A protein has these predicted regions:
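Phosphate-handling DNA/RNA-contact segment within nucleic-acid enzymes
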Residues: 1-58
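TOPRIM fold recognition
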Residues: 33-142
Length: 142
């Protein structure tokens, strides 16, 4: 699997020192049309091992900005792939800005920038929340 928009946005990503990872190519195009060349897309809400290697190799902060219908714990599972390797963040709409299937990129610049400003760092606390969720999920499957 490739990373859509990486070639076109590589220079801006290096200058800004961060990359925003979207699900849909449409989101990368939408942000680019708004003069924001920091976005790339992976075509789903699951990062492949190859995509992880490519993103880590950029040597910049990584921010996940998946659609609202992806749960916070599902986003945390993707963040876990970078835990302890890179500064990693995610956008989670706790304000009700997004509609059910909307991406942060679908919102006007002011709302997008607000959500980006209040991104959540995937740190030890977030890691523990994921482990707790996985444990509860495992209990339910027994």
């Amino acid at each position: 699997m490739n990373i859509y928009g990486l070639y076109e946005n590589y220079q801006t990503i290096q200058e800004k020192r961060y990359v925003v990872v979207f699900e849909s190519e449409k989101s990368t195009l939408k942000r680019y049309s708004r003069k924001d060349g920091t976005g790339v897309s992976i075509g789903s809400h699951t990062l492949s091992d190859e995509q992880v290697k490519i993103l880590v190799g950029l040597n910049v902060d990584i921010i996940i900005a998946f659609d609202k219908d992806v749960s916070q714990n599902e986003v945390r599972k993707e963040c876990e792939k970078f835990y302890g390797i890179r500064n990693f963040y995610y956008i989670y709409d706790k304000w009700g800005i997004l509609d059910k299937k909307e991406s942060p990129a679908d919102r006007p610049n002011k709302q997008y920038e607000f959500m980006l400003k209040y991104k959540i760092k995937y740190d030890e606390t977030e890691h523990k929340e994921l482990l707790k969720w996985l444990k509860e999920k495992q209990k339910q499957n027994i």
